[in-house]
Amino acid sequence: MIGGRLKSLRGKRTQEEIASHIGVSRARYSHYENGRSEPDYDTLQKLADYFQVTTDYLLTGKDKKSDDDMFSDPDLQLAYRDMQDFSPESKQQAIEFINYLKEKEKNRKPKNK
């Protein structure tokens, strides 16, 4: 049930804090947690974004294999968030630099003899 997952994800945050962030009243958010109502798709997506989980996780408790799995490292999460504000040119440069580092790393690994 989505309510239990929302309660667990909320942790020490208040219902008011989360409700404000996703644009619903505290009472409405409370209804989601208590199973009295289900969020619509847009609200579900906002909740998933806020908690940094997939909508699949919120709905089923299971995360299908997704790009989110690649971001378990906090440093990578931060880098990804920072890149969201980059211009298209800067994003392209970042991608090219990452590809350069990937090639460099591949060439550093010792080959099996």
Curated annotation (Swiss-Prot):
InterPro entries (UniProt xref): Cro/C1-type_HTH, Lambda_DNA-bd_dom_sf
Keywords assigned by UniProt, alphabetized: DNA-binding, Repressor, Transcription, Transcription regulation
DNA-binding region in chain numbering: 15-34
PROSITE patterns associated with the record: HTH_CROC1
A GO molecular function held by the record: DNA binding
Coiled-coil portions: none
Family annotation (Gene3D superfamilies): lambda repressor-like DNA-binding domains (1.10.260.40)
Highest taxon listed in the record's lineage: Bacteria
Domain HTH cro/C1-type: 6-58
SUPFAM superfamilies the UniProt entry points to: lambda repressor-like DNA-binding domains
Cross-referenced PANTHER family: HTH-TYPE TRANSCRIPTIONAL REGULATOR XRE, TRACRIPTIONAL REGULATORY PROTEIN-RELATED-RELATED
Function: Repressor of PBSX. Binds to four sites close to its own gene. Necessary for the maintenance of the lysogenic state.
Note: The defective prophage of Bacillus subtilis 168, PBSX, is a chromosomally based element which encodes a non-infectious phage-like particle with bactericidal activity. PBSX is induced by agents which elicit the SOS response.
Protein name (record): HTH-type transcriptional regulator Xre
Species whose genome carries this gene: Bacillus subtilis (strain 168)
Gene that this polypeptide is encoded by: xre
